[in-house]
């Protein structure tokens, strides 16, 4: 085997493994999967069960195109969170958020989902229309998800509900908006 092949074959194999991990090869959610997720959610003891937001989430499921997407998060931290069991007395909002992320990081990474952008906000919103109380944010974070299936597998795990309470207490308000993935930022093409 010549020297060039000894270099290229491992590189190609590594890229193919990365591509298979990073790409949703399962296609869009099927009706059966959606019904299974709905059943899991309805049978759960989740505090989120009565939230009208779940109708929007199920609509998001049913419109699945099988592609990856970004979740844009605006976070306003709670400066005086109540005491929570796992983080103890005197825990800051960051402590609570990190307890939540201890579950999220490994769940996201094993599904080729990861942070894309994270920054502290410099100033209150400079342009805001038709809403009150949305001027102030502390953090903007963008996460890439390989698929909607991955998002719902993470979010419907019973451990998620336990940890999600910590995220809720860590924040005064938050908005999470799914958006299309910009083509130019796709790591499969950058590599």
Stretches found by the model and what they are:
Residues 2-137, 180-191:
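Short S/T/G/P-rich N-terminal loop/turn motif that feeds into the first structured element of a domain
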Residues 146, 150, 188-191:
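An acidic-aromatic pocket/loop used at catalytic or ligand-binding sites
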């Amino acid at each position: 085997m010549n020297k060039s092949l000894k270099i290229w074959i491992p590189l190609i194999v590594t890229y193919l493994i990365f591509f298979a991990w990073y790409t949703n090869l399962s296609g869009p959610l099927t009706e059966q999967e959606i019904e299974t997720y709905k059943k899991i959610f309805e049978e759960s003891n989740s505090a989120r069960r009565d939230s009208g937001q779940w109708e929007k989430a199920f609509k998001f499921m049913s419109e699945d195109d099988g592609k990856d997407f970004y979740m844009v998060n605006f976070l306003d931290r709670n400066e005086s969170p109540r005491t929570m069991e796992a983080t103890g007395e005197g825990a800051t909002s960051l402590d609570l958020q990190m307890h939540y992320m201890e579950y999220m990081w490994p769940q996201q990474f094993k599904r080729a989902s990861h942070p894309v952008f994270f920054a502290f906000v410099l100033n209150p919103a400079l342009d805001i229309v038709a809403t009150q109380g949305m001027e102030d944010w502390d953090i903007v974070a963008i996460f890439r998800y390989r698929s909607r299936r991955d998002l719902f597998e993470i979010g419907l795990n019973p451990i998620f509900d336990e940890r999600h309470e910590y995220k809720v207490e860590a924040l005064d308000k938050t908005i999470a908006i799914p958006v299309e993935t910009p083509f130019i930022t796709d790591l499969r093409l950058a590599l």
